[in-house]
Amino acid sequence: MNTAAKMRELLSTKKMVVAPGAHDAMTAKVIGRLGFDAVYMTGYGQSASHLGQPDVGLLTMTEMVARANAIVEAAGVPVIADADTGFGNAVNVMRTVREYEKAGVAVIQLEDQVMPKKCGHMVGREIVSKEEMVGKIKAAVDTRVNPDFMIMARTDARTTKGIDEALERGLAYKEAGADIIFIESPEGEEEMKRINETIPGYTLANMVEGGRTPLLKNAELEALGYNITIYPTASIYVATKAMVDLWTALKNDDTTAGVMDTMVTFSEFNDLMGLEKIREVEHNYATGR
């Protein structure tokens, strides 16, 4: 079963699919090894890990596809992949969908921001017209080859134009053929409940630590009607703090010996990365030497 079909199966059989965010292939491998349902490839995290820059639309489609391919290979579970605005108009979206599908992702996320886009919890976002985004969604739906490959439409209208506009767009995007609707940055549980009372089908909740939406437990999100929860920032925030603490300790203490209890061991890391499997392959296919 391909990962897109697996994702559809998960959504049809589970009440809640939890997808932690991966900012690189190593993170995706850890998430998959820990038994989570899916991985979310975060554009926010790709900008930071690949460029050392904030999420303001600097990555190209080619760069994002390469990152998606590596994350898919490492994860071993379905990948929901951020594709920003689709990198242009409906014509650009068609190529983006083809490339993401070939990369093996299960779900592509397209949003209705104006290029260059910004993180969905930053101020200063602008959105395209509802009609333009509907056209882009229709182009995405018509372009996919595998019918199990899912199109997720995100609207950033809540912050720029209010919850009513966001709901109107969510309904329009669903009618245009989107499989999953993602209304970004609702402000409070009442708005979150209203989203799920209004939008038919699958909906996604975005849990950003320090963002505009309250952090709720997955059981609470499920009770509100959500089907998928993503955690796009948690891994990279924890990793960043750990690195700051580590290198501060080295600068102050002239050694890393004092922070070894915060690290995985050499063997633990190699096990997580799958070294034993590589050794088995080397043994099975080794020629005489």
Swiss-Prot record:
> Required co-factor?
Mg(2+)
GO BP terms: namely: nicotinate catabolic process
What does it catalyze?
(2R,3S)-2,3-dimethylmalate = propanoate + pyruvate
- Top enzyme class, one word, equals lyase
Q: Which UniProt keywords apply?
A: Lyase, Magnesium, Metal-binding
Per the record's keyword annotation, is Lyase included, yes or no?
yes
What are the GO MF terms of this UniProt record? 2,3-dimethylmalate lyase activity; metal ion binding
User: PANTHER family this protein is in?
Assistant: CARBOXYVINYL-CARBOXYPHOSPHONATE PHOSPHORYLMUTASE, CHLOROPLASTIC (PTHR42905:SF5), PHOSPHOENOLPYRUVATE CARBOXYLASE (PTHR42905)
Q: What is this protein called?
A: 2,3-dimethylmalate lyase
